[in-house]
Amino acid sequence: ALRGHNLDYLAWLGNASVLRDGGNLYSGNETYGYGPVWMFVLRFADLAQNIFSENRQVFRLVIILVLTTFDLMIAIFIAKKFSLVVGLLFFVNPISVIITGYHNQFDNLAVLVGIGAILVISEAEFGNRQKTLWFGLALIGLSLAVKQVLLFYPIWLFFRAGTLRQRLTRVAVPYVIYLACFAPWATSIERIKIIVEEIFLQRRGRSGILLNLAGADYAGTIHGATYSDLARQIIFAAWIIGVFAFGWIMRNRSIIHSLVVYLVVMLAFAPAYSQQQLILPLLAVFIYATTELKIFYVVTLIFMVQNSDELGIEFFFPFVFRLNGTIYAWLQVLLIIFSLRM
C-alpha cells in the first residue's frame, strides 16, 4: 500500500461516489463494466468511510481487508482439501498480496464463490439431494455476477455424467441466475443494450498468444491487415473450442480438480487478458506445483513487481517485462504446457 495504488482504485472511488448519490453504474456514462455484486462491496466501503470521515484511507483499507478475507477463505479451502502448508503458502504469496493490496482487484471473490459452489454441488451429488444441487448451481450464477471467471464452467458441468435433464439443468440454472442478477438495472431495452455492451462487448486486456501469432499489437489491434475482424473472430472461436475441449477431457475427474484446471485453461487460451487475472492459475500452482507452473509463478512475480501498472520496481530485464511486450503470450505458453499434460 505504501507504493500507492493502481488506477482501478480511482475507478472504485468514482463508482462509490455515483452509488452514494443514488446513481446507476449501468447508465452508460460510468466506467464500471463488472457484475452487480462488486458495487455492494464498494457501497459498504463507502459507508465505512463516512463513519471515519477524517481518515480518507478508510475506503481503501476496507476494500483491502475484504479482499484479504477472500484470500484467507480460499487458503482455508486449500488447507482443508489438500495441505495446511500449501494453504499458508497461498495466503502469503506475493502475487496475491500485490493484486489485493495494491491493485485492489476482486477476481478472488469470483473464485471463492465458485469454490463454494463446487463444494455444495459435490455434497449434493454424493447425497443425491436435488435442492442442494440447485443451490450450488445458483452459486455459480452468483460467481458470474461478481466476474465472468466461470463463464464456461456450466458447459464443463454439462459434460459430466448424468441424464440429459440433469446436464441441461447444470447449464441453465447458473446462466438464469446470472442474468436475473441484472434485473434491477435492466429496466428498458436501452438499459439492456448498455449492460450487454459494458459487460460482454468491451475489449479489455493485453494480447495473448493467439493474437500475437496473428500479428496483433499489445492492445489487440492487427495493423495493416484486411482480415483483422475475421482473425479476431477465429481466435475467439478457438478460445471457446479449446476451453470446451478440455471440459470434455476433464469430465470424469473430480469436480474440485476440474475447477482448478478450468481456471488455468480459461486463461491459457484467452485471446487477451488483464494482469489481475494472473491469480486464476494460482490454485493450480500451489496444489500441483509442476515445473512449468513454478516457472510461471516466478516469471509472473517478476512481472508484477516490475511493470508500471503494479509496483513499478524495475530490476531485472525490464524491457522483457514491459506491459506492451509479449510477456502475456509467454506466460500463456507455460499454462498451455500444463494444460496439455493434464
Regions found by a protein language model. Give the residues of each.
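Glycine-centered helix-coil hinge/cap
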Residues: 83, 191, 215, 221-224
